[in-house]
Amino acid sequence: MSRHFRTHTTSRLTFPSSSGGLAITRLPFSSTSSKLLLQQLSSTSPAAAATAVTITTSSPARNLQRARASAAEQGMEEHGKAAVGWAARDDSGVLSPYNFSRRAQKDDDVTIKVLYCGICHTDLHIVKNDWGNAMYPVVPGHEIVGVVTGVGAGVTKFKAGDTVGVGYFVASCRGCECCGNGYENYCAKMVTTCNGVDHDHGGGAATQGGFSDAIVVNEHYVLRVPAGLPLDSAAPLLCAGVTVYSPMVIHGLNAPGKHVGVVGLGGLGHVAVKFAKAFGMRVTVISTSPGKRQEALEHLGADEFLVSRDAGQMAAAAATMDGILNTVSAWHPIAPLFSLMKPMAQMVFVGGPTRPLELPAYAIVPGGKGITGNCVGGIRDCQAMLDFAGEHGITAEVEVIKMDYVNTAMERLEKNDVRYRFVIDVAGSSLAGSGDAKI
């Protein structure tokens, strides 16, 4: 069994207007992380509203919504490719075998045999309808590594036999300012790899993810996986990798010799440490858990380890960091962390706590310090991240499972009982539901 890490959902911070002249600014993180917000931007358009399905309770309206979604899928299936995956059919989140059809391959499409697919915490939110936008039946999975089995007549980037990846989204408008600048991940018409609605390519059908044997994707959203990267532990890079790589590049936290703090040592945090060290940076892991010191320093190669609850350690590290990447998805006090940053430094949030965080204005105003967020990354950044990972041998820490184990894996993921990411050996699994559960 290969061992390796889990990602968390990412989130952007927003600042509501203050009232009464108070110096406290509330940063309202809700269960709708930035991934959900991006999904909602597309699903609430007039066209998307006609096919979007929000399922919370059993009712005639719910059955009608299901029927409409099913009809849209059947329209796609008439000339599509037969596929089998594991889908959730209600908010229990339980996954089971599901036969469906991929869309027919178009001139600019790539057909991919799925080899491995990572499990992200977002998948758990989707199958349990935590965000109220699940379109059942839903096949999760957006950390896909596979091999090209077919290409359309107009495809120029790939050929049969190429090893490729697919990340968090499979379509965008390609005409807006965000798309033009390489930030398709912030396009208002971005279509997620699973539980999205694809009007341009999929005929308005719900997208189904990588917990399946095959997928058909427009070549613009397909990524080349460098030779030499282990395919199982490369899969989480399609989400966790770009989620930390992209903001590090955008905010200049990739310069050799600079000092970056990484808050949290989980699925995102451990990958952030690996990328930062490969950039040549000085890396300090910041955690509430002293027991993670050995893991951070000896296994991952961090330069320093800081216990955030230790006032002495915090004081000694004051004003030393050029920036902080905050990967924590649970509530935590953030005001003390700003004391670690140099003037004008940025704290980038890539985790999405569900409880509101409080930030006193004095923590950022005197030093001109900034706070921002990041959600995955565009195609350009994702390909650059994979190429960089290939050059430096960066992978995620994973626990490889077979599809039969996926429901147990979801239960463990909900309890944070994984070190640090689950990856499904899709090609090595019996998708009909038999075979060994774990490898």
Curated annotation (Swiss-Prot):
Binding-site positions, Zn(2+) 2: 173, 176, 179, 187
Domain of life where this protein originates: Eukaryota
Family in the record: Belongs to the zinc-containing alcohol dehydrogenase family.
Catalytic activity: (E)-cinnamyl alcohol + NADP(+) = (E)-cinnamaldehyde + NADPH + H(+); (E)-coniferol + NADP(+) = (E)-coniferaldehyde + NADPH + H(+); (E)-sinapyl alcohol + NADP(+) = (E)-sinapaldehyde + NADPH + H(+); (E)-4-coumaroyl alcohol + NADP(+) = (E)-4-coumaraldehyde + NADPH + H(+)
Reported function: Involved in lignin biosynthesis. Catalyzes the final step specific for the production of lignin monomers. Catalyzes the NADPH-dependent reduction of coniferaldehyde, 5-hydroxyconiferaldehyde, sinapaldehyde, 4-coumaraldehyde and caffeyl aldehyde to their respective alcohols.
Key word Zinc present: yes
Binding site for NADP(+): 122, 243, 264-269, 287-292, 327, 351, 374-376
Gene transcribed to yield this protein: CAD8C
Keyword tags: Lignin biosynthesis, Metal-binding, NADP, Oxidoreductase, Zinc
Cofactor: Zn(2+)
Name of the molecule in the record: Probable cinnamyl alcohol dehydrogenase 8C
